[in-house]
Amino acid sequence: MTHITESEMKQKYLDLLSQKFDSAEKLATEIINLESILELPKGTEHFVSDLHGEYESFQHVLRNGSGNVRAKINDIFKDKLSQQEINDLAALVYYPEEKLKLVKNNFDSIGTLNIWYITTIQRLIDLITYCSSKYTRSKLRKALPEQYVYIIEELLYKSNEFHNKKPYYETLVNQIIELEQSDDLIIGLSYTVQRLVVDHLHVVGDIYDRGPKPDKIMDTLINYHSVDIQWGNHDVLWIGAYAGSKVCLANLLRICARYDNLDIIEDAYGINLRPLLTLAEKYYDAENPAFKPKKRPDKDVSLTKREESQITKIHQAIAMIQFKLEMPIIKRRPSFEMEERLVLEKIDYDNNEITIYNKTYPLKDTCFQTVNPNNPAELLAEEKEVMDKLLLSFQQSEKLRRHMSFLMRKGKLYLPYNGNLLIHGCIPVDENGEMESFEIEGERLSGRELLDVFEYHVRRAFDHKESTEDISTDLVWYLWTGKYSSLFGKRAMTTFERYFIEDKASHKEEKNPYYYLREDVDMIRKMLKDFGLNPDEGRIINGHTPVKEIDGEDPIKANGKMLVIDGGFSKAYQSTTGIAGYTLLYNSFGMQLVAHKEFNRKEKVLSMGADELSVKRVVDEELQRKKIRDTNIGKQLQDQIDILKILMHDRYLT
């Protein structure tokens, strides 16, 4: 290969660039355009976390921009429209197709319906004009429905100073109605408003878990205009399963069985569970109370006796496979320090008790039919065959491939963005606030360095799906369950104890000290510095742990340097948190934390226009309004400008 000097590489790059900008005028226009964009206000960032498969709640928060849509409507219409009209307009923007059907049923003549169309189109045009005021025309054009760009731009930028065009604009709207395009136009305008009120979405982890529709959330995110993801522990579990980890696969199947969500596997991703059911029915009892599926809060119809029986058996079968599969990993990776989790070896099968963490407990609801006491890690031939088939099906699911590839493309373990650190779980520390170190391939790592190496191994495992027992695949499982994992954030996962030990003290999972030290300002400053961020201006934005507002816990910690935005979309947590989750908005004026009430049904929003939103709390207000210049995108644009100016001086200025 020919050696190219840095100077030669620079010249080749400038040569390529000059083909696109082949005149001084074109180059100057681009520089002027980019320099001008830097002076615009920064766009609104929207932070959500811990979606846990709750598609309907997530959809609503996305459609209303955590209250941003209603705020914009209030800004321009509060003195012009009644509260009911504002509610109706908000509901139309959130759910345009459904709201249109309801509205049209209320009219008894075409004439009054047409007047409504004219009024509504104008209101939506006014709303878009207001919402797009900090965007370039080019950016707005990309947000408009493609088939109506010309018509909408004419209505947006109409100038009627001399009244010459009044008939033109009237005809434009009348023809839209006459040609029966008004419904589609209103739907397109409504989705444009949704898109304009949020410039960029951050999903701070856990799209997957116990909720019923993570696949629909993934489809929504794939089609979203601008998004990034910080992986959560449940997301990494799914990535691990797709990447070839059978123990990750067993874990997620167990969770789906426990929460009556196996239809995610079968219906959403098309994976055949019949071989697992056949195995389960051969060996396991339908009456084991510890393994009966939890009642799903979104299901109106209860499981039939037969369905409950099948799930209970599957639940036991996959749990035992999971405990067996964990053992070889723990033994071949002593650096994981997980010997206490060799639970099947610690059982006295004659006396039905276990000695764990130096304490002996009697066991209840046991189902050790397939365990060989002399070799507890040994899988039956049938168990091995079932797991081989399931892994193959998992890796061959086209929909799952698409979703996992998107998670890898848009996801990271952590993200420094616009001066803030976004991370789902924690940065492992000891009781003194020192970064905890963990050995990977002979090297001790901590802090940012540790997280970078974890992420490297997640990507390596994903790229080598055929390797199922390598260090990278094992580390993906460790991220799910290990004590130095930034995603798990606890000392041990007590799954076995919860199933088989009555004593609730054994169920306790001790959290990493990070979770109480994050109240300390100096601790947060130290972490921000370790991740290359300004400790005076930056914040950590965290998910993973539900904020128990009902007990007086505050999501704003360390004098506003730490923001915790999980409170849970997951219905299972809402009785302990007292709310249905936090989201965060960060616009050019500052940050607002939004606490949400439980989202019941969109029908209520459609009929009454009532939002399931509660309080917005101002986290801070910027002393000086932030511009695009102050953001990550601004830095990228400035780099482009610098290169273009070099080209200008190199080729066109003498």
Curated annotation (Swiss-Prot):
Catalytic activity: beta-D-fructose 1,6-bisphosphate + H2O = beta-D-fructose 6-phosphate + phosphate
Pfam families in alphabetical order: FBPase_2
Listed EC numbers: 3.1.3.11
Biological processes, Gene Ontology terms: gluconeogenesis
Pathway assigned in UniProt: Carbohydrate biosynthesis; gluconeogenesis
Essential cofactor(s): Mn(2+)
InterPro entries found in the cross-reference section: FBPtase_class3, Metallo-depent_PP-like
Keyword list, A-Z: Carbohydrate metabolism, Hydrolase, Manganese
GO molecular function: fructose 1,6-bisphosphate 1-phosphatase activity
Keyword Transmembrane helix in record: no
HAMAP family: FBPase_class3
Family assignment from sequence similarity: Belongs to the FBPase class 3 family.
Protein name: Fructose-1,6-bisphosphatase class 3
